Design a protein with these regions (language model features):
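A broad detector of the eukaryotic-type serine/threonine protein kinase catalytic domain
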Residues: 160, 230-231, 255
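Mid-domain, small-residue-enriched loop/turn segments at the edges of structured enzyme/sensor domains
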Residues: 202-208, 242-271
Length: 271
């Protein structure tokens, strides 16, 4: 305020402007809840009766406990106990002692008695997601859902979470081809492209496949390959110029993520 005091956002009549569209935001929240809660039921059914769930069958208990330990050390409870001067032995005892707590479930909150350590394993069972919708013309964010439940899971999957970019990375390979003199009308045979394990430093030979066989053994243009997201075309470009050239171009364009220079980059396998 002009007099040096802080504004009260609730009582001082401030106006908050946002690009969020309330109708789209409502649809986004409802859509995420409907879809993820349905997937969660399928997930429960899949792992029912399996003692190590939701971890792979070949995981040893030491590996599972290590994951739980990591979750424990990243928790707010652990940080507060460390700040209070508790030893690791004392903290472990506290985390294994049952206390009253409230847990998240898609059917509503559950009031129960559980050890903090067991609650971490319980929470590890949930499928998470986030979504953001942006107007491509203005860049305005119209809907934003960071996770399945802010009260219980304060991790923002939109801003912080990492995910494979997939086919959205393919235009970078086409850009490289154009940069190197290829025309959008340049034709490429739509046949399997094999990356030899010895030449490319792989464990075994690798030949990426297309999602369908509608255009098998046809000559297709770069333009058509991009429009239809055909894997064998980006694999062909990758084999012509190599992964280092692709990474260099991505960095020049402005991608700041760590990108491994490997053949599978042609399918957008990095986070």
């Amino acid at each position: 305020k002009p007099d040096g005091t802080n504004y009260n956002v609730y009582t001082d009549g401030l106006k908050v402007y946002t690009t969020i569209n309330s109708r789209l935001q409502k649809y986004a929240e409802e859509g995420l809840k409907s879809h993820i809660s349905s997937l969660q039921q399928d997930f429960y059914t899949h792992w029912k009766g399996y003692s190590k769930a939701p971890y792979p069958k070949d995981f040893e208990w030491d590996q599972i406990n290590s994951i739980i330990d990591q979750g424990m050390k990243r928790s707010e409870r652990y940080r507060k106990l460390k700040k209070a001067g508790k030893s690791e032995k004392e903290i472990n005892k506290i985390f294994k002692t049952k206390v009253p707590m409230t847990l998240f479930s898609w059917e509503g909150e559950i009031d129960t008695t559980l050890s903090p350590r067991d609650s971490i394993r319980y929470n590890k069972f949930f499928i998470h997601s986030g979504m953001m919708s942006m107007d491509p013309k203005t860049g305005f964010v119209k809907a934003y859902v960071g996770g399945i439940n802010y009260k219980h899971f304060k991790y923002d999957h939109v801003k912080i979470g990492k995910r494979q970019v997939g086919s959205t990375f393919k235009p970078f390979l086409y850009s490289l081809a154009i940069q190197e003199g290829y025309s959008p009308c340049y034709e490429i045979p739509n046949v399997p492209v094999v990356f030899d394990k010895e030449r490319w430093g792989l464990e075994k030979d690798w030949a990426p496949k297309n999602s369908g066989n509608d255009f098998d053994e046809m000559n297709i243009t770069l333009k058509f390959g991009l429009a239809n997201s055909i894997n064998t075309v980006t694999a062909y470009i990758m084999k012509q110029f190599g992964p280092h050239a692709v990474v260099d171009l991505a960095k020049k364009i402005g991608i700041q993520s760590k990108i491994l220079a490997v053949p599978s980059l042609c399918l957008g396998t990095f986070d």
